[in-house]
A protein has these predicted regions:
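Switch- and interface-adjacent substructures of P-loop NTPase systems
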Residues: 1-124, 140, 158-159, 175-179, ...
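GTPase G-domain guanine-specificity segment
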Residues: 138-163
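Short secondary-structure boundary/capping segments
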Residues: 96-97, 145-151, 186-192
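Long, contiguous domain-sized segments
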Residues: 174-177, 181-191
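Class I S-adenosyl-L-methionine
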Residues: 169, 192-198, 212
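Short conserved micro-motifs at the rims of enzyme active sites and ligand-binding pockets
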Residues: 92, 142-144, 182-186
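Conserved beta-strand/loop subsegment of P-loop NTPase cores
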Residues: 78-80, 124-135, 160-173
């Protein structure tokens, strides 16, 4: 699961989630089960490996998954689903298709009347869901509309596949903390829109590795006009090498203070719009 999550594959459908983020269950037998090869459809023999795997999986659902939903999710009537579209775009169409699959499965968990062990726990109806593509600051604002169009297409297909109804679903490209600023760079007769920030140590573009200290102007590339392009496995980079779009991770900005010593809030992108959609009606 950890290998599948790395940038090379950037997969998103990676349950059980606690295997990647064990928290207080780190080292617990509750996280020591695995799928087995196809076996005959009969009850496992007592004391067998199959019986132990089945018992631990059922215990995981009972003691880890259900309490999480019962204590947290079931009390919500608004939900925000954060997706790392940038990482998936870096990895290509297969990662984008898997991201769509993950969003579908998430929405299916919120679908009323589905009749599985999760949705039977719901006592409240979720009436607004925001699908938010994070790290919008890794793109120039000229590409934000295209990013939102990609996420809209992904969300619409996920809603249809999950047969999800009864809630308003919106999308937004945002950055809770803006780690870059924008600028332009002359390249011959062409003026390129760039983002300026400090890439994390070890991030790479075209063979160059960043040291985590140097501020750099980066042209991440343009997202395609046609949304379906990023989901089409037949589309590759023109020369078969690095992709036409490439994003790196940036260090957060330094906190700034006024002359009076007051610490300023961190900059963001569209966090206000996200809050307006999720809770604006409660504040009117």
């Amino acid at each position: 699961l950890k290998a599948c999550k790395l940038d090379e594959r950037a997969l998103s459908t990676l349950p059980p989630g606690r295997f990647l983020m064990p928290g207080d269950l780190d080292g617990s037998p509750a996280l020591t089960f695995a799928p087995l090869p196809a076996l005959a459809e009969r009850r496992p023999r007592p004391g067998s490996l199959q019986a132990m795997m089945e018992r631990r999986y059922e215990a995981y659902k009972t003691h880890v998954v259900k309490p999480f939903f019962r204590e947290h999710i079931t009390r919500l009537d608004r939900q925000i689903v954060l997706i790392d579209a940038m990482q998936a775009l870096n990895a290509g169409p297969a990662a984008m298709a898997d991201l769509e699959r993950a969003v579908t499965e998430i929405l299916a968990c919120f679908r009323p009347g589905r009749g599985n062990f999760l949705t039977d726990l719901f006592s409240r109806r979720i009436d607004r869901i925001l699908v938010a593509a994070t790290k919008a600051d890794h793109l120039h604002h000229e590409s934000h509309d295209r990013l939102q169009a990609i996420v809209r297409r992904l969300a619409d297909r996920a809603v249809a596949r999950a047969n999800f109804t009864g809630a308003d679903v919106d999308v937004v490209a945002l950055a809770a903390v803006r780690a870059t600023r924008e600028g332009t760079v002359k390249q011959g007769r062409e003026t390129l829109p760039v983002i300026i920030g400090t890439p994390l140590k070890g991030e790479r573009i075209n063979g160059d590795t960043f040291d985590g200290k140097t501020e750099t102007a980066i042209f991440p590339g343009d997202l395609p006009d046609k949304v379906d392009t990023v989901f089409d496995p037949s589309v590759t980079s023109p020369d078969g090498g690095d992709p036409a779009i490439r994003f790196v991770r940036f260090r957060p900005p330094k906190l700034e203070r006024t002359a009076e010593g007051v610490t300023l809030s961190l900059p963001h992108i569209r966090l206000d719009r996200a809050l307006q959609f999720l809770i604006g009606d409660h504040l009117a």
